């Protein structure tokens, strides 16, 4: 289910999708603590939800990007770079936490050894670049558990920044539907896609 918020601090749960269940522990912790989140992993994903995902990637204060060993992750590894760039472009008060499993699952590796070899090489390359060049608002973590702890620390840091500065991030306080409608060319605007309940 996609969770949306129109104000406050939101954690974007990007990264490995498919049949992956890594988000479950995060969602349970966030709901217990009252932390807002965006979960792009839905059963009935439709192309029009891409705009909602893009909005959250550009606006959520904390972006999580785990690349697990459950897939070869060619697309996810490329999206990792985009996530880091988006955090830099849209403001220094945004944070990205990245976890890249250095290997692929054994069963997956046996199914296509060449793709697994390429994936492991790409994972090492992306990790090396991130560790060497990551800006101060990008955190490379070593496990999903570390990512959850880091995300909660980052939410607390965002809350402190908001209290200290006041909520001057007016752009973030408006809904994805508002921005999709406001940015649509005049005369061609279709209603913004409804978010699943």
Cite the ranges covered by each PLM segment.
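Conserved catalytic or regulatory cores that recognize and/or transform ribose-phosphate-containing ligands
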Residues: 1-197
């Amino acid at each position: 289910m996609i969770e949306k918020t129109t104000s406050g601090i939101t954690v974007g749960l990007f990264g490995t999708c498919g049949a992956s269940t890594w988000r479950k522990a995060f969602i349970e912790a966030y709901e217990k603590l009252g932390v807002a989140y965006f979960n792009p992993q839905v059963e009935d994903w439709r192309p029009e939800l891409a705009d909602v995902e893009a909005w959250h990637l550009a606006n959520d204060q904390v972006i999580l990007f785990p690349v697990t060993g459950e897939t070869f992750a060619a697309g996810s590894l490329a999206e990792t770079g985009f996530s880091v760039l988006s955090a830099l472009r849209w403001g220094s008060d945004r944070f990205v936490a990245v976890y890249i499993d250095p290997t692929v699952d054994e069963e997956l590796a046996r199914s296509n050894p060449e793709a697994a070899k390429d994936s492991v090489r790409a994972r090492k390359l992306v990790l090396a670049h991130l560790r060497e060049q990551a800006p101060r608002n990008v955190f490379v973590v070593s496990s999903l558990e570390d990512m959850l702890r880091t995300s909660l620390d980052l939410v607390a840091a965002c809350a402190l920044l908001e209290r200290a500065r006041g909520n001057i991030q007016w752009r973030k306080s408006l809904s994805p539907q508002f921005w999709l409608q406001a940015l649509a060319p005049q005369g061609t605007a279709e209603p913004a896609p409804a978010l699943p309940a």
